[in-house]
């Protein structure tokens, strides 16, 4: 099985100058990095445009090769293509229509994902409002978004259901902005040793970091 997880807004906050914590927010990920092949990635987009990262990851095509008028391929390009290519089709060619499946714990029409994933040849795009919809969709404390733990459970269900190899795509939602103070007993409020931030910036940072810790 090959599972590609695009973890919403994930980064290592300990690498940002001026940002520090008295405890490591992502110790498990750091430990895994130390014992296996790992590295750093420079994102081609910041502050929005999740679907553009998705498009580039699934197709291997950089937005830099397109004209500047192409802002969001998921909305402007893929719906108008006859046979758009994506990596999942390698599994489809070998195992048939159910060679690839996708999960996004939000709404299917966002960025026209329901149209695009069908064009790419995924057997389903399983969302909050799709048919079939995702089974696991609990949130954490006051967060409006499905937790990463629940999102992973949906992927595990697909792995256990299918006997042959498949390509599974997951785009998570837990750490999506805005970063309102929605986690109860957030230990990173006390562990935040960063300096020079406004009250709003501290709240955003500490909520975001708690989300990363939950992902970890």
Locations of regions flagged by a protein language model:
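Solvent-exposed soluble domains appended to multi-pass membrane proteins
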Residues: 1-7, 12-216
